[in-house]
C-alpha cells in the first residue's frame, strides 16, 4: 500500500487503486483505515489514547483541548508549520491499518520544498527511533527504509491482550513533512525484547522535549538495527521474571516467535523487590526456563545484565551498586547455558562512575536515579549495539555497524539551558544541559 501526501495527486495515483491520496484534513479513524493523529481524533476514540497501540505521544493535559497539530499541504506533501514551539517539538503522526500482523518494510520519502528543514527525526510505532536529526536543504528529497513489527500487546494498566493491526509513523523537526509512504509485508527475523521500565517503550507528552521524557533502551535500539530484522518490544514497567509470564506477556512471544528469531531478556530491577526472586534462586531458575523454551522454538536467547542506576552514597562520593548480584547471576547463567550475554550493567556503571552523579543525572528522567530519559535510552542502546558488534560471531543480531562508533557520551560544560534551535544544530544527539520541566503556560 502506498500513500501520496499533499494537495496535488501524483500522476501515478490518478486512477490507481493501490495509491491513496492523503490530504491534511484526513484525520485517522479505524473505519477509514488511515489518517493523521490530532487532538480531535485522539479524543474521539478511546483506543487512540492507549499509548502502546499508537504513536506513544499524548498532548500535555493543559493542551488536550487545543489544536496544536494542524496539518497543512503544498505540492511537496503534508506538513506542520509549527514543528517547534517554545517548550518543545510538535509531532505529526500518520497511522495506517495493515491487513495482517507481522513484519513490514516501510519506505518513507520526505521533500523539503523551498524551505530548509532542520532536525528531522523519525519514529515508528510507539516512539521507536528510526532516524535522527536530518537537516534538509531547499528542494532536497530523501528516502528512509526501515522495518516495523506489528504484534499483539498487553498495554500498561490493562490485563487483556490488545490486537493491533496498525503502523504509526511520526516525524518531528522544524517543519516535519510527509511526501510518500509505502508499506509492504516483509519476511525477516524478529528481535523480541523482554524486560522492565529500563527497557520499555515509554510514552511522551507533547510539546515534546527528550530530556523530560521517560524512555527504555529498547525504544531506541531500533535505530541501530539494520533492515534485515524488525524489533518487537514487550518490556513494561513493573515486570520481573515471574509476572512477565503470569500476566500473559510471554504468551504473545511464544505465539509468534519462530526459527531464526532472537529473544533478549533483561530483568532484575523488579525481581529484587521479592525474596523468592532473589538473584541466586527464583530469578536464576526463571531465566533458565526462558532460555530453554526460546531455544525449543529455534530462536536465539540473549541475556542483558540489568542497567546500572545513578545510585550513590549520601554525599555522592562512592557509587552504590544495587544490581551487582543480578548481573553476576546473568554471567553465571550465560556460562552454564552457553548463552550470548551483553554486560550493560558494567558498561553503564563505568560511564556513570566516570562522569559522576551530577552529570550522569542528565541522562535519567528528572528526579529518577534508575529510569533513563530519551538521551539516556539513546546512549544505552548504543552501548548495547557496540557490544553486539564486538561479539557478533555468537550474537549475530543484524545491526547497522556504521553507527556503532558514533555513540555520543561526553558531557559538555554548558552552564545555561540549550534552546531548541541549539539542540537541533548541534553536531550529534547531545546530552541535555539542564533539567527541563514541563509546566503549564501562564495565561496572559
Enumerate the language-model features and the residues they cover.
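Conserved catalytic region of serine esterases and O-acyltransferases that act on ester linkages
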Residues: 1-3, 8, 87-89, 357-444
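Anion (oxyanion) recognition and catalysis
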Residues: 288, 295, 331-335
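A short helix->loop->beta-strand "cap" motif at the edges of active sites that frequently abuts
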Residues: 261, 292-300, 339
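Substrate-gating cap/lid alpha-helix
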Residues: 311-345
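Compositionally biased, intrinsically disordered or flexible polar/acidic segments
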Residues: 1-205, 213-215, 444
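Conserved SGNH/GDSL esterase-like catalytic core that processes O-acyl groups on lipids
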Residues: 174, 184, 189-193, 198-292, ...
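Short beta-strand segments at enzyme active-site cores
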Residues: 264-266, 301-305, 341-345
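Aromatic/hydrophobic pocket-lining residues that form the small-molecule binding cavity
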Residues: 283, 287, 327, 377
